[in-house]
Amino acid sequence: MKYPEMTLATLAILKYPNALLRKKSIPVEIFDDNLHNFLDDMYETLIESKGVGLAAIQVGRAERILIINIPREEDKQQYKEDLLEIINPTFLTQEECVEWEEGCLSVPDFYESIKRFDKVSIAYKDRYGNDRILKAQGFLAVAIQHEIDHLNGVLFVDKLPILKRKKFEKELKKLKKESQA
């Protein structure tokens, strides 16, 4: 029997200040082909956007789903076999503070240092609903925290000190004026 070829879709990424980005995501309860197709579309979107992480809420779906694909050290390339699909994550441990420069697909062209934990461990489910535990450090730990923040309606710019936050708002207004000109 021949099956129709599956086509992947690139999803539209919501941009700040879209109000949906502030919505708290709900846990996933059904692990089926619809979820698998959505995860595949998220991956396609992540790669097309040249990002390292993407939360479902960033593409308009308020479920506790995120994906991360960190480029490899040796060649700075992303490989599908390194993809993490993380569903319904909860933190188990968080250790040692670090500052890391972050950016976000929903806040394009803005980067700033944010305080995060350098080491985390999380419990989560994979695409099939299997329980998993992940220990992460460095860039991966930071990316996990950034994406879980999205699931809770928090953006990295919310973590900026007040002066840096004002700088961000000023730059955003300037960009809006330029795009309307």
From Swiss-Prot:
Main enzyme class: hydrolase
Enzyme Commission no: 3.5.1.88
BP GO terms, sorted: co-translational protein modification; translation
Chemical reaction(s) catalysed: N-terminal N-formyl-L-methionyl-[peptide] + H2O = N-terminal L-methionyl-[peptide] + formate
Cofactor binding summary note: Binds 1 Fe(2+) ion.
Top-rank lineage group of the source organism: Bacteria
GO molecular function, one term: metal ion binding
Swiss-Prot/TrEMBL cofactor(s): Fe(2+)
Database matches in InterPro entries: Peptide_deformylase, Peptide_deformylase_sf
Keywords from the named record: Hydrolase, Iron, Metal-binding, Protein biosynthesis
Active site, renumbered: E147
Residues annotated to bind Fe cation: C104, H146, H150
Database matches in CDD domains: Pep_deformylase
Role according to the record: Removes the formyl group from the N-terminal Met of newly synthesized proteins. Requires at least a dipeptide for an efficient rate of reaction. N-terminal L-methionine is a prerequisite for activity but the enzyme has broad specificity at other positions.
Protein's recorded name: Peptide deformylase
Species whose genome carries this gene: Helicobacter hepaticus (strain ATCC 51449 / 3B1)
Classification of source organism: Bacteria, Pseudomonadati, Campylobacterota, Epsilonproteobacteria, Campylobacterales
Gene name of this polypeptide: def
